[in-house]
A protein has these predicted regions:
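Amphipathic alpha-helical packing segments from all-alpha helical-bundle domains
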Residues: 120-142, 150-160
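Hydrophobic alpha-helical connector segments
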Residues: 12, 76-111
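Amphipathic alpha-helical segments used for helix-helix packing
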Residues: 101-123, 127-130
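Short, amphipathic alpha-helix enriched in basic
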Residues: 2-48, 56-63, 67
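Residue-level detector of well-ordered alpha-helical segments, enriched
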Residues: 18, 35, 61, 65, ...
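Hydrophobic alpha-helical segments that form the core
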Residues: 149-168, 177-185
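C-terminal peripheral helix-coil segments that are non-catalytic and often amphipathic
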Residues: 2, 169-218
Length: 218
């Protein structure tokens, strides 16, 4: 093992250890710099170590928790064959798995939700939610590469955030009902959209750009 690999393994292990300490302390301290320092101290890390491990402080720690829950959700979905489910069932199961992963660390996740709601963290919240939506759609079998790739992830991102809030603060039944209603809304829209050539404007733009770049076809 090279020195770089050893350092990388240490960093990965220590990130998870610090995250465990943070989850334990978040209900009392909130999600902030104080929490980061306390969690790092619990693992015997100096301020210098903390700055190396989590240069963006509480933002990095929030991202670690979010991605842990993503990984846990995907592990829970690993034994499910999405091909045996209708598309709406795939999305419902995927969202449910992600919400339940977060609910395990409910009190800490509530602090993260408040932290992510701050205007200064909007970019982080958007990036992480989009990544979650992408992983869920890929599990569901989505292979779109056109503008539908982006619209699907944008729509699912818009479902995930309020559903997460409902799961944490109002419980599973409220979250499940919300998700079911939103999926029904989306499916109704897709049925209405079917047969209408909404791709035409995008196709014309693509053709125009191709002509500008490569010239008119002979």
């Amino acid at each position: 093992m090279t020195e770089a690999q050893h350092q990388g393994d240490w960093a990965d292990r220590m990130e998870q250890a610090v995250l465990d300490s943070a989850i334990e302390r978040a209900p009392a301290l909130g999600w902030n710099g104080r929490l980061v320092r306390a969690a790092c101290e619990a693992q015997g890390l100096s301020r210098g170590d903390e700055e190396l491990l989590l240069p963006n402080g509480a933002r990095d720690l929030a991202a670690l928790l979010w991605r842990r829950h993503d990984d846990q959700a995907m592990a829970a979905l690993a034994d499910i064959d999405p091909a045996t489910l209708k598309i709406r069932e795939r999305i419902a199961r995927g969202v449910e798995a992600r919400l339940e992963a977060a609910a395990v660390d409910g009190e800490a996740e509530k602090r993260v939700a408040g932290f992510m709601a701050l205007p200064t963290n909007a970019d982080l919240a958007l990036t992480l939610t989009w990544a979650t939506a992408d992983r869920l759609w890929r599990w569901a079998g989505d292979s779109a590469t056109d503008w539908n790739h982006y619209s699907k992830r944008a729509i699912l991102s818009g479902i995930l955030v309020p559903a997460m809030t409902l799961r944490l603060f109002d419980g599973k039944a409220a979250a499940d009902a919300f998700v079911a209603a939103r999926i029904e809304n989306v499916m109704s829209f897709e049925k209405w959209k079917a047969g209408k050539d909404f791709d035409a404007p995008m196709t014309r733009i693509t053709d125009l750009l191709a002509r500008l770049r490569y010239g008119a076809r002979a």
